[in-house]
């Protein structure tokens, strides 16, 4: 590892600053116990940046991210800023420009249901009795969200609107390579999601994915149409390892996978570019309704930090130790409100303390 690893810390809005404080506890242990040399610099983003500087992504924040090796992101948004035009609101005016600026073409969303938390899943107990571990890999910078032309118009027949789904072969190839590489260190299965029976873009998607798969003979490739995939995830989620998806399909199916785990407060995410520069954030939102109550689940933020350690710093053993510390905390029965019975639960800061203690003690 380089002499000093620079992390831009962007707590943001809502519960973002609260759960980020718990991630700092882990970062302190990484410096003290594992001798990592970290340079942590905090910047405003989202609603708080609008309040202070009039813009969701200030130039100072963008420059700070450019001078960093990775971004640890909290959350942005809230009703307070709903009066703004959509394009100026925290979510639209901060995250999307960051993804575009750093060419973060891949989004990794783990959806893991631990056996000791299977009661949280809305699925039948016989379906989730062994838990599941799915990694959704979503192409993030192409497809219908960014394709042109798009627009909304009126003519003599009425009002109409249109969007364009477009993918280049190189966009599909690079996301497919990432999926197969990651599958090689997991259970060696990739299921590619498309709609190749009706969409030309999906026909190309399937062709390129098949082509890339030839370079990974040890990884089993399968294909599902998006509608069937959504059904199969409900019917038997344990059959899946990695789901490889286009932008819009990944947007939909990763939320479905998150929901069947029972708590989005447990789920991290990573958005990466070709240089493994990444933006790491909880999969959930800013949850302004519980802001300041010390009841938010910090696990997604801590696991997002673990993903940063794994993918941008390439320190898998240390990332494994963080993941194990979370595992031990849950195994011992510690629960925040969102994953509790509603009566017996601990506070945000207490969960952070417990996970940090397990990491520090090296259990």
UniProtKB/Swiss-Prot annotation:
Compartments reported by the entry: Cytoplasm
Assembly and binders: Homodimer.
Single GO MF annotation: NAD binding
Family that this chain belongs to: Belongs to the isocitrate and isopropylmalate dehydrogenases family. LeuB type 1 subfamily.
Annotated function: Catalyzes the oxidation of 3-carboxy-2-hydroxy-4-methylpentanoate (3-isopropylmalate) to 3-carboxy-4-methyl-2-oxopentanoate. The product decarboxylates to 4-methyl-2 oxopentanoate.
Gene label: leuB
Enzyme class: oxidoreductase
Name the record gives this protein: 3-isopropylmalate dehydrogenase
Cofactor remark: Binds 1 Mg(2+) or Mn(2+) ion per subunit.
Main location: cytoplasm
GO biological process: L-leucine biosynthetic process
Binding site for Mg(2+): 227, 251, 255
GO terms for cellular component: cytosol
Entry-linked PROSITE patterns: IDH_IMDH
Source organism (scientific name): Buchnera aphidicola subsp. Schizaphis graminum (strain Sg)
Keywords assigned: Amino-acid biosynthesis, Branched-chain amino acid biosynthesis, Cytoplasm, Leucine biosynthesis, Magnesium, Manganese, Metal-binding, NAD, Oxidoreductase, Plasmid
Site residues, Important for catalysis: 145, 195
EC annotation from Swiss-Prot or TrEMBL: 1.1.1.85
């Amino acid at each position: 590892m380089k002499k000093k690893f620079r992390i831009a810390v962007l707590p943001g809005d809502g519960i973002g600053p609260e759960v980020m404080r718990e991630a700092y506890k882990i970062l302190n242990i990484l410096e003290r116990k594992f001798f990592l040399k970290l340079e942590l610099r905090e910047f405003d983003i989202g609603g708080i940046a609008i309040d202070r500087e009039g813009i969701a992504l200030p130039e100072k924040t963008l420059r700070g991210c450019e001078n960093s090796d990775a971004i640890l992101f909290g959350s942005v948004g809230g009703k307070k800023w709903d009066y703004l035009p959509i394009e100026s609101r925290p979510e639209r005016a901060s995250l999307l420009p960051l993804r575009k600026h750093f060419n973060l073409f891949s989004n990794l969303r783990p959806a893991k249901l631990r056996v000791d938390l299977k009661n949280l899943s809305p699925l039948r107990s016989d379906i989730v009795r062994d838990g599941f571990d799915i990694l959704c890999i979503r192409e993030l910078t192409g497809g219908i969200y960014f394709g042109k032309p798009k627009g909304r118009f009126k003519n003599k027949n009425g009002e109409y609107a249109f969007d364009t789904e477009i993918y280049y072969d190189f966009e599909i190839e690079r996301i497919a390579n990432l999926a197969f590489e990651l599958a090689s260190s997991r259970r060696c299965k990739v299921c590619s999601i498309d709609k190749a029976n009706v969409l030309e873009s999906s026909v190309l998607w399937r062709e390129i994915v098949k082509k890339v798969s030839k370079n990974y003979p040890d990884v089993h490739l399968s294909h599902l149409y998006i509608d069937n995939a959504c059904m199969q995830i409900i019917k038997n989620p344990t059959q899946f390892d990695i789901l490889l998806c286009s932008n819009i399909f990944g947007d939909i199916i990763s939320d479905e996978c998150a929901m069947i785990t029972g708590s989005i407060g447990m789920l991290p995410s990573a958005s990466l570019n070709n240089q493994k520069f990444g933006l790491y954030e909880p999969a959930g939102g800013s949850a302004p309704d519980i802001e300041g109550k010390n009841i938010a689940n910090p696990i997604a933020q801590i696991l997002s930090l673990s993903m940063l350690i794994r993918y941008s710093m390439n320190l898998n053993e240390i990332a494994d130790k963080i993941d194990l510390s979370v595992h031990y905390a849950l195994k011992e029965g510690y629960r925040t409100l969102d994953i509790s019975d509603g009566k017996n639960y601990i506070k945000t800061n207490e969960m952070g303390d417990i996970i940090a203690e397990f990491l520090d003690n090296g259990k």
